[in-house]
Structures are given as structure tokens and as C-alpha cells.
Regions:
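Surface-exposed, short loops/turns at beta-strand junctions within beta-sandwich domains
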Residues: 713-720, 819-826
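Active-site-proximal helices and loops of the catalytic beta/alpha 8
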Residues: 30-32, 48-54, 73-81, 105-117, ...
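Proline-enriched interdomain boundary motifs that mark the N-terminal boundary
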Residues: 587-601, 612-614, 751-758
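Short, solvent-exposed loop/turn segments at the edges of extracellular beta-sandwich modules
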Residues: 728-736, 834-839
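Flexible, low-complexity linkers/stalks enriched in Thr/Pro that connect modular domains
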Residues: 712, 739-753, 845-850
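Substrate-binding/active-site clefts of carbohydrate-active enzymes
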Residues: 29-48, 55-273, 289, 293-307, ...
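Aromatic sugar-binding surface patches on proteins
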Residues: 682-710, 803-817
Length: 850
């Protein structure tokens, strides 16, 4: 590679910033943090487990389609009914509500995690012209089910044939090439341009009825307007208006065709809901021009800027169920030029089904002949430029649609995680039962309490996933090795027998004498590598040596099976080892002062369903006005052995990041704001910064290995926050940065939780009382009407302790109670609110019952 492509954080080739050494940056192949495809969990659960997502090291979360589904509220969501109905308090989707999704996006953004959703633009649901009452009910919101001059309206005929016209799995296919123009989210009932409104409800639904509230689904003409040129169509001076986030009622309805409706929905998801990326469902079944228009819809539409003020590009990636590069590559478009912002470009990739099919076929069982020769040449990444550099393809080994390679899934997962480029890990939370669809996922995707092979692989990817790909063993014997040059060596085996295989790897990218530490934990796992009377077959540390001027290293490949100490064959499937440069050690991790209490995690769950629901990470509660962050590193002796002293790993710098990057040391800025650097978003320690290896290098005076920073908690929002301290290995060889990350999750609880009455209205012979958590911290709310004057707080809390007056949770920030026989007129309402820390607050408010 000759330069750095600044595409987006997800797809860019990042620069290794050698913070301590002060050397120039080098452009190298990069493995961005992985995408977690998380299905079958509610937004509430995903938000609750944001701490685990952060600790595991995911950079992106991909959720299912958020729309109202056609077949009911238990649907996964691919059968779309209404694209602008993401769930409401009185009728959530399977996953929750629009407010819940918005809040989840904000929480993930605070953790420096991007949120992706499935974007369905090929089809709607199963209802059609033949569905009784559907036409009279208005059909689908925003799309004409039939028209006087076109019986199929905005859709293709049920008899149409071909990938881009037929009904996929019976789902009605949108005809994006048609140009029927309407106001598709109607506001004014007198506007003749409106799409036809439904007249008679069917299945409790009535579509396309004009509603002033629909203004919020439109951009505000003239607000935040940009003018762009589209090189795909040749159109110039195209006005693109922004949604008015401060006053959504200023949205301006406009006429549009079906493609325009889909474009508006994409823009709305990005700007209003807080989505950062779109996984485009069934992209093989839409015509190519549609993808270009989606590129236009999201181009420069992310209002969340990077720390240096530059544009953060929306990332899209297509599902194209095909192994042919000639079919896949046209879906890859990476031509955004930030130096020419008026020219529309795309930041689009595609899921790598070509590699998936090779992994599934060759790692379904052990000892498949030619496995590695097939796999290493299968990636779509090779098809665009002949290099394994992450320039094309989003890799995966399983998804909601397709099964994993059952025999050697760990080997397959290690391969994709340690390669350059973007990759997906799939997790099924099982919150809604053990349904056949979506398919099962990795049960250990969020096993952060004690760690798992998967989470350790993710850590290795994040800390050592920089450096160009170089093949080190060719795989003809069932063994395959590649190096992330000067960073880590990956050893993979698909052999069917037990034991290990010794090999010497030559021309490795490490200096003679360099120690390499096994990073996956397999070498230390007593099941994989049992103690055999004081020795183990697989070493935890190997040393690079020189032979004839060539750097070499002796390694042992771990086979997927082991002979136990009592002579049994044990197939564990963990034919994976990763040896990487050692990095700084801090046995106590991030130390915090002024911790008032701990919200403990719930330990390692026994199954996928529990893993989907239960937070494992401990959260430290801060109630003081400030707290100190401290890291204490120690001289690195691998395996606590003086013979394995690695002074380079002592480290020459540590930096602090709070949330996604904010000023915590009081100098008025984020110290490192260059996108793509390993220091992006981090701050210098101001109270004390004393790395073991000082600015003078190895031969100069040494520091104490201590770093301290006082953080002003009064400047932090109430609720959860995320701390990362990153400590870098000392390098003078120009190699890519490697580091250790030390993390803590905190909860700021300086102020009492606040709530207020949102509404009180007639319902079911009484009134419904809605109370909103105005600061978003409430876990439970109780309400009492007209308590006697002078009722003490102790007496109120006694009522609460008996479970009295508890409101039902109906939305992320909304609680409801039905009050029967409440006389009309004024009443004094006593509201008691608790947040997850146990902190409570008693408030009084006068309301008027209807």
C-alpha cells in the first residue's frame, strides 16, 4: 500500500501511531474492531449489556430490521410493513420502541461503538392484492399496493421472474424502477398529491392516513442544505436537506417515488435515530442503480462528526448470496473523496459469501484435503487487487441465515478475526425462545467475565491486528500459518488426529531474540494443552532466532484434538494459536478512587439464553465530584520468569480515553484526534505520566510505570461511562503499534433521578398516568395520589417497600399506571423514582385529572 485511504473508521486502513517512540507513522493493513451481529434480544437488553460489548472489544453492533413487521410483532422483521414505525409504548416491536432504539444508539456511541441495522429495500411483507381487506386498508404505509393505471402499484407482479423482479421467499417485491410520485407520508388530508389513504381497517391496521405528526419523517427544506454532484447519474447541484433535530415539526412533505421513499427512510435512520451503518438485505435482488441512490441518501448525512471535525461516513454492506466475484465486486464502492465533498461517493462493501462457502465446505469436518489452498485464495479481498489487505469483503463464518462450519468453527473464526479487513461475529441472544430462525450463534460472544477463546481472539485482533498479511506456512499438510507482519503469527490446524506438529517458520518479521507470547489462552488451557508431568506440548512463549542471517522461529501447531493424560482422545476443536509481541502489564488494571459501591456483574451464564440477558461486567459507582484514574505497569517477565524478561514490553507511553473521546485533563481539547491512529480519542495523563521506558529509550533513565489523572465528575452526564487506558509497547523498528488495553465501566450517580408527569388521560373507566424519566436514569417509578399532608419520607418509602404504587415500564423512559375512579380535578401526585444504583428521589407534582 502506498497511502492511507480515509474512508471511514470501519473500512479505513489505519495508521499505527508510535506514541512513545516519536517515529513517523506507517500505513499498514488493519483489522478494525469486529462487528457483532446481535439478534433475538430487546433494545433494553442490548443497552444493559453495553458494558460487556465494550469490555469484549466490539466496535460495531448490527441489529435486525427495526421496522414494524407485516406478520405481527413477534417477527424478526424482514417482512416489512411500516418503515417509519419502530415501535411505540402502546405497541412495541419484538425489540422495543423508537425511543429505546434511539437511547441504545446514544449509549453505544458513548462507548465508542457504532450501531448498524438491517436495511430492507428489496421487498415488504407477505400481504398483497390477494390479501382480504388489505387494499381497502391502504396497503403498506408509503407504498401503493395498486393504482388505477398500474395494478401492481409500486411493486412487481406476482408472476415476475428473475432475481431482481421475483418475490423472494414470497415477500412482495418493490419495483424501484417505477416512477409513481406521491406524498408518501401524508400530512394534509386536502393535498391531492397524497398516496391513497386506507378507508377500512384490516388486521387492526389502516395505512396512509394523513397525520400532521408525519412531518417529523421529512427533512426541513432549506435546513442544513448541501448541494452535491452525482457522478453515477451526471446530475449536478442536487439539494439535500437535513432533518430538523431541534424542531421535527418543520419537516416539509414532498412528492417522491418508491426509491425516494426508501432514500428518505435511510436518511432518517442515520440522522434522527442515530444509526451509523446499514446492512443491505437481499441486495442481489435489487437493480444496481438503487444502491447508487442509497449511497446518495446517506452521503454526508451522519451528524456525528469525528473528533477532528471531519465527516464520519456511513458504512453500508450488502448481502449478496453468491460466490462469484463478478457478482460480488460491483457491490463494493469506496470512492468518497473528502477533499471533494461536493462529489457523491460510496462507502459500501459486501458480505464475503465467497469466503464463507469455502470455510463452510472445508472446515465442516477435520482433515479435508486441500483445505488451506482453497481457503487462502477464496476471499473476495483478493479479487479486487490481488492482495489480502482488507480492501473488499466483510467476512463471516455464520449468520442468522446460514450455519457455521460445525467441525472447526473456532479455526474458522480465528482465521477471519486475525485477517485484515472487516469481519462479523454472530450472536443469538435467545431472548424470545429457541426459534429455528434466526439460526444459533456463538454462545461465548459476550463471555467477558472470565474470558473465552472468542473474546481472547477479539482482544488479539484489537491489540495486534495491524501489519501486512504474509503467509508463513502453506497448508499442504493440514497446517497453515500467516503473520500480521511484525505483530503476530497465527497458527491454524484442521488435522483430525490428536497432538501437535512442529515446524520452523522462516523469514518472520521479528528481530532475533524477540519473545512471542501465545495470546488465545489455548497454550495455557489444561484441556487443550494438559500438563504432562511438569511439561506441556505447546509452549506459551517462543523465541525468534537467527540462522544464516534469516529470522526464524520454532513453533508447534496445536491440532483440534488432544490425548488426555489418561490416554483418551479429546476433540476440542481448538486448533488455533496466536503468538504476538508482549505488551505492557498492569496486574491491578485501571484503579479508581472515590468508588462508592459496585454494581456486580452476574458471572458466566450457563447457556446462550442467559448470556443474552445477563450483564457480566462490574460497574463502579461514582457519587463524588471527582475521581482519579490510575494505571501502574510493571517490568514484564513472561510467565514470571527472569529468563523471559522482555524490557521492550515495559512500555513507553500510556494514554486515557473516556467514552468515545472527551477532554478529561482540562486543556480544552481531546489530545489525539487524528482518525485512524491507535491513539485516536485518547488524552495524556496530567497528574502523573511516568512510563517505565522514558523519552530517552532503553538506555536512558527509567520511570516508575505510573499514570494518574483526576477526572471532574461534575462535567459528566449521569449514568454509564466507559474508561480505557492504553499502554504501548516500546518500538524502534518502525513496526506497527501493539498495546494493552485496560478498561473499567463506571456509573456517575451524583444527582437524584428526576421524573415528571408526561400525561394523564381517560382510559378504560379511569385514567392512565404516564410518568417520564427526564434524565433517563430511572429503573423503577412509584406514584401515590393525594397522600395526607405531612406524610414523612419514611412513611412514603414504607409504602414503596411493600410494592405499592409501582408503575409499569412501557418505554425506555416511560412508566404507566391505570388509576380507576379518580375524581376529575386537581390532585397532588407523589412520585418516587429509583435508578439502578439504588439512589431514589421523592418529588411532588400537582396534576389535573380529566
Amino acid at each position: 500500500m502506498g497511502g492511507v485511504l480515509r474512508i471511514s473508521r470501519l473500512t479505513q486502513f489505519a495508521v499505527a501511531l508510535l506514541v512513545g517512540a516519536g517515529l513517523p507513522a506507517w500505513a499498514v493493513d488493519v483489522s478494525p474492531p469486529p462487528i457483532l451481529q446481535w439478534f433475538e434480544s430487546s433494545y433494553r437488553t442490548v443497552e444493559e449489556r453495553a458494558a460487556d460489548l465494550f469490555m469484549a472489544g466490539y466496535g460495531f453492533v448490527w441489529l435486525p430490521p427495526p421496522y414494524r413487521a407485516d406478520t405481527g410483532d413477534q417477527s424478526v422483521g424482514y417482512d416489512v410493513y411500516d418503515r417509519f414505525d419502530l415501535g411505540r409504548p402502546d405497541r412495541p416491536t419484538l425489540y422495543g420502541t423508537e425511543t429505546g432504539l434511539r437511547t441504545l444508539a446514544k449509549t453505544l456511541h458513548r462507548a465508542d461503538i457504532d450501531l448498524h441495522v438491517d436495511f430492507v429495500m428489496n421487498h415488504n411483507g407477505y400481504s398483497s392484492l390477494g390479501t382480504p381487506g388489505f387494499v381497502a386498508a391502504g396497503g403498506y404505509p408509503g407504498l401503493a399496493i395498486t393504482l388505477p393505471n398500474d395494478i401492481d402499484g409500486d411493486f412487481h407482479s406476482a408472476f415476475a421472474m428473475g432475481d431482481q423482479y421475483e418475490r423472494l421467499a414470497g415477500l412482495i417485491d418493490i419495483a424501484q424502477e417505477k416512477n409513481h410520485r406521491f406524498i408518501r407520508s401524508p400530512v394534509d388530508p386536502a393535498d391531492a398529491r397524497n398516496i391513497r389513504a386506507g378507508q377500512v381497517p384490516a388486521f387492526g391496521r389502516l395505512a396512509n392516513v394523513p397525520d400532521p405528526g408525519n412531518r417529523r419523517f421529512y427533512p426541513d427544506r432549506g435546513h442544513g442544505t448541501i448541494f452535491v454532484f452525482d457522478p453515477r447519474t451526471g446530475e449536478a447541484n442536487i439539494p439535500v436537506h437535513a432533518f430538523n433535530l431541534n424542531d421535527p415539526t418543520k419537516g416539509d412533505p414532498v412528492v417522491e417515488n418508491a426509491t425516494g421513499y426508501l432514500m428518505r427512510n435511510a436518511q432518517w435512520l442515520i440522522q434522527v435515530i442515530g444509526i451509523d451503518g446499514l446492512r443491505i438485505d437481499a441486495a442481489k435482488h435489487v437493480q444496481g442503480f438503487v444502491l447508487d441512490f442509497i449511497d446518495r441518501a446517506v452521503y454526508r448525512q451522519n451528524p456525528r462528526r469525528l473528533l477532528d471535525g471531519s465527516q464520519k461516513d456511513v458504512f453500508t454492506y450488502s448481502e449478496v448470496y453468491d460466490a462469484n466475484p463478478a457478482v460480488l465486486l460491483p457491490h463494493v464502492r469506496k470512492d468518497i473523496n473528502h477533499a471533494d465533498p461536493g462529489r457523491i461517493g460510496g462507502n459500501r462493501d459486501t458480505l464475503d459469501f465467497k469466503l464463507y462457502f469455502a470455510l463452510k465446505e472445508n472446515l465442516e469436518s477435520t482433515a479435508t484435503l486441500g483445505t488451506w489452498q482453497t481457503i487462502k485464495n477464496a476471499a473476495l479481498d483478493l479479487a479486487d487487487d490481488g492482495l489480502h489487505n482488507g480492501s473488499a469483503g466483510v467476512t463471516f463464518i455464520q449468520s442468522h441465515d446460514v450455519f457455521k462450519p460445525f467441525g472447526l468453527e473456532n479455526v474458522a473464526q480465528a482465521y477471519t478475526l486475525m485477517m485484515p479487513g472487516n469481519t462479523v461475529v454472530y450472536f443469538n441472544g435467545r431472548e424470545f425462545g429457541n426459534r429455528d430462525f434466526p439460526k444459533p450463534g456463538r454462545g461465548d460472544a459476550l463471555s467477558v467475565r472470565d474470558g473465552s477463546l472468542l473474546t481472547r481472539l477479539i482482544e488479539a485482533r484489537n491489540t495486534h491486528g495491524r501489519g501486512n498479511y504474509v503467509e508463513r506456512w502453506d497448508g499442504t499438510d493440514g497446517l497453515f500459518a500467516f503473520e500480521r507482519e511484525s505483530s503476530a503469527i497465527v497458527l491454524l490446524s484442521n488435522r483430525g488426529d490428536a497432538g501437535f506438529d512442529s515446524r520452523t517458520l522462516t523469514q518472520v518479521g521479528f528481530a532475533p531474540g524477540t519473545l512471542l507470547l501465545e495470546l488465545t489462552g489455548n497454550a495455557a488451557d489444561p484441556r487443550v494443552n494438559p500438563d504432562r508431568g511438569g511439561r506441556r506440548d505447546i509452549p506459551e512463549v517462543v523465541r525468534v532466532f537467527d540462522e544464516g542471517g534469516v529470522s526464524k522461529v520454532n513453533v508447534r501447531f496445536q491440532r483440534p484434538g488432544t490425548i488426555t493424560r489418561d490416554g483418551r482422545f479429546d476433540f476440542h476443536g481448538k486448533g488455533v494459536l496466536v503468538y504476538g509481541l508482549a505488551t505492557p502489564q498492569a496486574p491491578r488494571g485501571v484503579e479508581l478512587s472515590n468508588v462508592a459501591k459496585l454494581l456486580p456483574g452476574q458471572g458466566e451464564p450457563d447457556n446462550d439464553a442467559e448470556n443474552g440477558r445477563r450483564r457480566q461486567t462490574d460497574i463502579s459507582v461514582i457519587t463524588a465530584g471527582s475521581f482519579e484514574v490510575r494505571l501502574r505497569t510493571r517490568p514484564v517477565r513472561l510467565l514470571d520468569s527472569d529468563a523471559l524478561r522482555d524490557v521492550w514490553a515495559d512500555g513507553d507511553q500510556a494514554l486515557l480515553k473516556l467514552d468515545a473521546g472527551r477532554d478529561v485533563n482540562g486543556n480544552g481539547k481531546v489530545d489525539f484526534a487524528t482518525p485512524g491512529s491507535t491513539a485516536y480519542g485518547f488524552e495524556r495523563f496530567r497528574q502523573k505520566s511516568s512510563p517505565l521506558i522514558g523519552a530517552g529509550g532503553l538506555g536512558a533513565a527509567r520511570g516508575e510505570g505510573e499514570f494518574r489523572q483526576v477526572v471532574d465528575a461534575s462535567k459528566l452526564e449521569e449514568g454509564i461511562h466507559f474508561i480505557t487506558v492504553r499502554a504501548w509497547r516500546h518500538r524502534t523498528d518502525g513496526g506497527p503499534a501493539v498495546f494493552s488495553d485496560f478498561k473499567r465501566v463506571i456509573y456517575i450517580d451524583r444527582l437524584p433521578p428526576l421524573s415528571r408527569v408526561a400525561s394523564i388521560r381517560p382510559a378504560g373507566g379511569g385514567v392512565d398516568l404516564d410518568v417520564r424519566s427526564t434524565d433517563g436514569t430511572a429503573e423503577s417509578v412509584h406514584a401515590f395520589v393525594d397522600l395526607p399532608a405531612g406524610t414523612s419520607e419514611q412513611a412514603i418509602l414504607a409504602h414503596v417497600g411493600q410494592g405499592e404504587g409501582r408503575l409499569n415500564w412501557v418505554d425506555r423512559d416511560l412508566f404507566r399506571a391505570h388509576l380507576g375512579n379518580l375524581p376529575s380535578g386537581p390532585h397532588v401526585l407523589t412520585i418516587v423514582t429509583f435508578e439502578p444504583t439504588g439512589t431514589g428521589n421523592i418529588q411532588k407534582e400537582t396534576v389535573t385529572a380529566p
